[in-house]
C-alpha cells in the first residue's frame, strides 16, 4: 500500500470515470478493447468529492506498495493522476464488482485477454501486480462499469487506480468491455491500461470497474450531506446507466458477474499476501471474472488481506446492480456503515439492471455485499435479487468470507465488515428484513468486526486455511466439472482458465438470468437470513476443501468456473472468489447460500439453482446460511439443492440453465437439483453436504438448513455426481444430476415429495403396493415387502424370499434409489402409486389372498414372478388367470366321472359294508347305529333318501350325483378325503 502512487490514483480516476461514464462507453467488446488499449483518464471527466479524496489519501499510504507496478500504467491515465493520488489509499478496499448481466459475457473475454496481459505485467512485480490486480478487480471495474458514482468517484477512482495499476489493462479491459456491453460509456475508460497493468485481472478488474465502487468514508450509516448528494447523483447516473445496461443486461450481467467472481477468487488466493497482494491474488482468480466479468450488479468486496488494509482500514465495496460501492473502513470498519449506506444507494441505482432500478438496487445492495464473496455470475444475479431477495446477501457474505479467508481472518473481518456495511446499506435501501439479518450479522462485524469477524473467522478459519492452502485443487475439481459448464457458457474465454472463464461466465450468465428473474422474487430475501455470517461460514468451508485452488490465478479460474460450480465457489478458498462462485451462480448454491438447489431449494441447486437456485436456492440457502456451521458444510453445496433442487419454480428454470453451467443449478441442486421441493433434501435441491460432497444444490428448498449442514451430505448421496462434486466443482456432476431439465427437476421433486408423502408406502415399490398396502405395516416399511401384506401368513417367508426380495432388490433398490430417481422413474413412480390404489383393491376385494399366497402365486410357482406381473395389471386379469390355471388339472370331464365312479340308486341297507364300516368307526355305538340307518351327503348335508341317485367315489364315499358331479367338474378329488377319483378305482366297482 505504501507504494501507492499518483499513477494509481489516475487509474482509479479512470476506473471511476468508467463507472460514471458508462453510458457512452462502447457497447462492444471491440470498443472495450480499444478503450483498454487506449484508456482515457477518467479523472478529467470526473471530479471527486473531498471526502472521497480524503479516503483515498488514507488508503493510499497502505496500498502504495501495491500501486508501484500499476503506477507505470497509471501514468497513462495522467489526467486522473491527481485524483488517483487522492484515492490511492482507497485501494485498501477490494472493490467488489456488481453483477452486470451484460458485462459478464463481455468481460469474460476481456478478462481472459487481460489475464494474459496481467501475467506479462505481473512478471516485473508479482506482489504489486497481485495487489494492484485485486485493486483493479475490486475498484476499477466497479467504478468504471457502474458509471457515475459521484460520492465514490474520487475514492473509487483512486481505489480503482490502486487496484488497476497492475491489472490496469485487465481492469480497464474488463471494465470497459463490461461497461460497453452493459452500459455505453462516454468516457474512454483507463481500464485498458489498468488491464494491461494486470493481465490476470483483466476480465475481473474490468467487471469490477463495471461494478461501480463507492468509496465511503468511515461513517457507514452517517454520511455527510455531501456524500448523500453524491450518492444521489451517482444513483441517478447508475440508474440511467443501468437502464441502458439492462437493455444489454443479458450479456453484460454475465460478464460483470464473472469479474466479481474473479476478484473474489484472486483475493482468496493470495490470502497470505498483503492486502493488495491478496488483491492481486484475487485478480489471478479474476481471470475467471473476465470470463464471467461481474456486472455492476455484482459487488466485489475486495478485502485487502495484508495488514496494510486492516479490518478497520479495509475498503468496503458495496455494489448494487449498477455499481459497486467501495467504502474505506478507515477504522473498525467505519466505512462499512458508509458502505452500507452507499450500497443502499447503489442497490437502488442498479435496480435498473434487473429492470427495477430502485427495488433491484436495494436488493442488489444486499446482494452486493454478498457478491464480493461469491463473485460469480449467480452472485451478480443474486445481487440484484438480494435487494429483494436477501439470498444474495449471504452469498456476498460468503464470498466476502471467501475473500477474507483468502487474505486472512483480519482481512475476512474487513471483508465481512464491508459486507456488513453493504448489507446494512441495503437494508436501509431495500430489504430491511433481509438486510437486517445480513446487516445484523454484518453490522456486528462492522461495529467490532467480531461478529462478522466471527462469521468471517468461521468462514475465514475455514477460508483462511483455505486461503492458506490455495493448493486446494478447486480448480482441478471445478475445472473438469466446469468444462461441462464451460461448454454451456457461450462467452467464457480460455484466456484465463478456459474452465474458469467459461464457468465464470456461465455462472455470471445464469446469475444474470436468474438475477433478472430473481430480482422480482422475494424468495431471495431469505438469503439475508443466512446473511454474511452464515454464508461466509458455509462458503469458507467449501473453500477450505477448495483450498487447492491455489493462487490468485488458480483461484481466479476456479472462481470463473464457479458460476458453474457452486461447490467451486465455496471451494474458492480464496475469499471473494470462492464464495461468490459457488453461491452466486449455482443452483447448488446451497453450497454458498443454499442456492438451488436448491438445488439448488436448490440445486441445485440449483445451479438451478443458478440464479434460480440463487433465488430459490438463495432463499433456501438463506435459511441455512444463518446456520454458519451447516452453511460452511454446504458452502460448496449450494443447492444446489438443487439443484435440481435448488429451486423448483424459478429455481427450476434457472437451475436448468444455471445447473447446466455451474453445476447444473443448480438445481437440485440439485440438488440436489435437483429439484427443489424435495429436490432431495437428501440430494442436493439438491443442496450439499459440504457441498463438496455435493452441494445441497439441489439444495432442497425445505431441507437447506439441514441440507446445508447435514443434508448436504445426503444430497451428495442422491446427487453425488452433481452435487457432491460441488466441492470439487459441483457444477459438472451437479449439472448432470442437477442439471436436469426443469421438467426432470420437477419430476424428481415430485418423486421426492411423493416419497415423503407416502414415505412408508414407498411409492417406488410399485409391484407390491397392493399387497403391502393391505398389510398393517403398509407404508411404514422402507422396503416394500409384498409378503408383508401376508406377513402374518406362515407361507409368506419363503415367498418373500423369492418374490419380495426380488422386488425389494430390483424395484426398491433400482426404483427407490437414494433419491436420485430418473425422470422416467418419477413417471414410473406416479403410476405405481396409482397401482397401489388399483392393486390395493385386490387385497381388499380378496382379503384372504394375503392368507393364501398360493392363490396369488398359482401360476408363478409361488415365486411371485407371475404374481408381480398380474398384480401390476388389474384385478380382473388376475381373476382370469386364476380361472385358467384353476381349471387346468383340477376338474374331471363327465366321461371321467362316469368311468371312475359308481352311480346308482341309493338303497338303505344296514348291512351295507359301507354302513358297517362307519358304524365301527363310531365310538358311540348308539349314535352310530342311529346314523347307520341315515347316511348324509357331505356336500349338501342332506340325509340320503331311498332311491335317490347317488354316486360312490373310488374312496367309497357316497354323495348325491348332482352334488358330487358339480364338485368333480371343478375338482376331481373326493371332497372328504381328497383322493383323486382317477388315482385308484375301487376293486368292487
UniProtKB/Swiss-Prot annotation:
Pfam families: RNF111_N, zf-RING_2. A motif (SUMO interaction motif 1 (SIM)) lies at residues 298-302. Disruption phenotype: Mice rarely develop beyond 15 somites, have a reduced head, fail to undergo turning and die at midgestation. CDD domains: RING-H2_RNF111. Ubiquitously expressed. It is found in: Nucleus; Cytoplasm; Nucleus, PML body. Residues 173-183, 506-520 have a biased composition (Basic residues). Residues 131-144, 248-270, 278-291, 345-355 have a biased composition (Low complexity). Zn(2+) binds at residues 937, 940, 960, 963. InterPro entries: RNF111_N, Znf_RING, Znf_RING/FYVE/PHD, ZNRF3_Arkadia_E3_ligases. It comes from the Eukaryota. Residues 97-109, 393-451, 548-558 have a biased composition (Polar residues). Binds free ubiquitin non-covalently via its RING-type zinc finger. Ubiquitin-binding leads to enhance the E3 ubiquitin-protein ligase activity by stabilizing the ubiquitin-conjugating enzyme E2 (donor ubiquitin) in the 'closed' conformation and activating ubiquitin transfer. GO terms for cellular component: cytoplasm; cytosol; nucleoplasm; nucleus; PML body; protein-containing complex. It catalyses: S-ubiquitinyl-[E2 ubiquitin-conjugating enzyme]-L-cysteine + [acceptor protein]-L-lysine = [E2 ubiquitin-conjugating enzyme]-L-cysteine + N(6)-ubiquitinyl-[acceptor protein]-L-lysine. Residues 63-195, 213-293, 335-367, 388-475, 506-559, 641-675 are annotated as: Disordered. Belongs to the Arkadia family. The SUMO interaction motifs (SIMs) mediates the binding to polysumoylated substrate. Monomer. Interacts with SMAD6, SMAD7, AXIN1, AXIN2 and SKIL isoform SNON. Interacts with (phosphorylated) SMAD2 and SMAD3. Part of a complex containing RNF111, AXIN1 and SMAD7. Interacts (via SIM domains) with SUMO1 and SUMO2. E3 ubiquitin-protein ligase required for mesoderm patterning during embryonic development. Acts as an enhancer of the transcriptional responses of the SMAD2/SMAD3 effectors, which are activated downstream of BMP. Acts by mediating ubiquitination and degradation of SMAD inhibitors such as SMAD7, inducing their proteasomal degradation and thereby enhancing the transcriptional activity of TGF-beta and BMP. This is E3 ubiquitin-protein ligase Arkadia.
